[in-house]
Amino acid sequence: MPTSDQLARRTFLGRTLAFGAGAVAVSRLDAAPADAAKLPYLQDRGWLVGCWTRPWAKFDYRVGMDAMAEAGFRYIALTGAKTKTRRVIAPATTLEESEQVGEEARKRGLTITNVYGGGVPLHEGGESLRKMIDNCAAAGAWSVLLAHVGNEETFRECCKTIAEGCDYAAEKRVVIVLKPHGGTTGTGPQLRRAAELIDRANFTVMYDPGNIYFYSDGQIDPVDDCPAVDGLITGMSVKDYQPPKNVALTPGTGQVDFPKLMARLRQGGFTHGPLAIECLAPGDPAHTLAEAKKARRFVEELVGG
């Protein structure tokens, strides 16, 4: 007799296959207005291999920018750094500070594709999200990244806040991006549910295979999960995973089958966009730099770059 875990997994796979079978017909990429494709984040520039600031989060953000430039990256995504908010850009960051972040990136030949400012309190309304959008625009960044859409009680309200935020962001040529992070948006089917409620051309999904494993305690393989978001994915946070709960890995050294995953993502319509390396094997700055170079080569080879 199957265990409860096996039954839960069968239910998940059944839902995933059902979503995947009809995904092309309801693809937000297919349905998006032509002007949405002109937004910087959604333009077809090929594969944009980049890196998050997370491996350098205990340093000033300029240290991370220097290292990423030295490692050969031209595209970066902003998250943790040694600031009063613990983020490079957060809702509490001023416009002037955000402008300075953008200038520091451009001085190093770096383009900012994504900005994660921490947990934006969507259930409290749209003020913090609008501040993030303003700050991203000031920095010349292409998108605001969100990692949650509230709990089951606030889910619909939070989706409404994001939809209204998308309307505001469109005026500033900014895209709002959601990636899986457990809770109500921890799997592909949950991400699709959010996307269907938000229903905006400048809303999109950044896939995160490491988080699919992490928040399912290793029970859900991202290769099985990703068909549920066919047509929605325009970027990937390149993160690996090792059980029981480790994502502090250089991509290609863990459990994620990246070649198989990329083949399935491409089948689902993900053919260009940011590929931002989020985590590296920890170590001193010299070690981190070496791992960043190794990870860049791995991702470039993965997509034939």
List the model feature ranges, each with a label.
Residues 58-68, 124-135, 219-226:
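Short, acidic/polar
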Residues 2-20:
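N-terminal secretory signal peptides and thylakoid transit peptides that target proteins
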Residues 16-26, 63, 104-111, 117-207, ...:
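Active-site acidic/histidine proton-transfer and metal-coordination neighborhood
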